[in-house]
């Protein structure tokens, strides 16, 4: 229902019936008569954005629950533990170094940065002592470290236009999300959910 509502609302209001007919035409090959412009807006833009947003929401909720369960601390999340900051650093490094600015290369860079940040936080926590409190404090320190590295990379390595694009990307925006993004996000989210539920 939320996906359908997200596809119906926007600058151009589209009835829910049109959203349902468009989805049925695209998914099941139904032959409902739908205005071509409305169908293009719904399928190519709004439903794709709504699906990516849903995948992101599920992934964030799942990662938060897993971290809170592992650390037995309600404060634990990817932002406080520095994982999100490390992912940002990895993606920015990939973009700046010209290793590819495509969806897969940015995602792999972000994943590598997140793993590196997690390793750094684990080392800091081990040095600080055992306990969930030490992990949280190490995560905050790691988050600040990787945020500083990201800012340094952007300031030293990018021209003004590139820096603007990177900062816009870091702030997060789903306006450019399309179906290839869904095909990348959905399997990862489903696999992660299955693994977490199985454990």
How would you label these PLM feature ranges?
Residues 1-199:
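Alpha-helical transmembrane segments in inner-membrane proteins
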